[in-house]
Amino acid sequence: MRRSFAFKITLLTLAWLLLAIACQQVPAKVFWPVVFGALTTPVALGCTALLALYWLRRNWRVALLPVVALALTWPQVQRGLALHAPINEKVSTKNQELGGGKTLRSTFFAPPPNTVSLLSANVRIFNVYAQLRDPDFASSIGFIRWLAESPADVLCLQEYYDEPGGSKEDGSVFRSERALGRANGRHSFVSTTLTNAIGAEFGMAIFSRFVIVRRGVIPFGKLSQNHAMWADLVRPAARTGRGRPDTIRVFNLHLQSMAMADADIAKATESRAGLRQKAPNLLRRFRNGAVARGAQVDTVLACIARSPYPVLLAGDLNDPPYSYTYDQLADELQNAWATVGLGPGFTYNGRLPGLRIDQQFAGPQWQVRGCRVHREINWSDHFPVEAVYRLR
C-alpha cells in the first residue's frame, strides 16, 4: 500500500513538472496565472530529485522514471542551479580604497585578446536621489570609479544617470559619461529617456573599447526607462585572432519591473490585515508586469533575428529563469551563467532575496568562457554580472 501511494505521488510529481515547464512557454497575455505555474518549476525539480533518491533505495525500475525525467529536463536544472566545474580562465585582482581604512577587493577576468569581456549592471541612477545617497557621495563615487577601472571591453548599464556639465550641488560627481567613456578609452552610446531641469540625463548606456559604428534604440511603446538599445562594435584585427577585423552586435535591455514598493511587500507579509490591504494592488502590478515583459521580449527577439552579426545581450529582465521572458531568450541564445556558472548566481540585492533577474546571453556563434556575479558590489539593488566570450 505504501509503495502504491508513493508511486502515485511520483506520477503526480512528474505531471506537475511537465506542466510547470509548459507554463514557461505561455505568454502572460494569453492566460496570466501561468506565471505562478512556471515559478513552481524549481520546486517540482527538487521533488523529482528526492523521489529519485527514494526509489533508488527501494526499486530501481521505478527510479528510472524520475531519473529519466531529470535527465530530460537537465537544462531546466541548470537554469536555476548551474553545476559546472570552474573554467581555468585567467583573472586579475584590483583593490579600490574606500576611505576609513577600508579596501574593496574585486576579481575580474583577464582573458586573452581574442575574446570579448562584458560587464552589465543596473546602477540605480548611481544613488543620486536623496533617499539613496550618502552624505559624502561615497557609494556614487565608488560605483562610478569601480566601473571606470574595470577591465571589461563593454559595459551595459541600466538605470543610468549622467550630469554632462556637473551641477552646483553635486560638482562633477555624476559626470559619469566622461568618467566611463573618454577618460577610460571607451566609446559611449547613451540612450536618454529623460532630461531634468539641471540637464541631467536618465536612461541606459553602452560603453565600448571597440569603435561603435551603428546604434539604435528599441522603444516598447512610449520611450521610458524600460526599453532596449543596441550597438554594432568593430573589433580590430589584433583582437579577433583571425587576422581581420569583425563586427559584433550588443543589446542592452531593461524590461518592465513589477513596480512593487518594498514597504508594500513588507506590510503584506506582516499580518493578515496587511495582506488583505496590499495583496490586490500587488497582484495587479505582478500581472501587468508579466504581460508587459512578454510583449517586450518578443519585440527584442524580432530585432535579434534580423541581426547580421554575432549577438551578445545583457540586461535586467526583471524575471527569474523560470519565466516566459527567460524561456524565449534561452530558445534562441545561450545563457552565460547556465552555461558555465556554478551555483544559483543570485543577482538581486533587494528585499526579495534569491533572485537571478540580471542576465547575459550569447548567440550560437559564441563560446562562453566564464561568468561571475560581483556580490562584493552592494551600491545598488542589483549585483553586476561579468562574462567572457570568444567566437567559435
Predicted features and spans:
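Structured beta-strand-rich core segments of catalytic domains in phosphoester-bond hydrolases
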Residues: 70-115, 125, 144, 154-263, ...
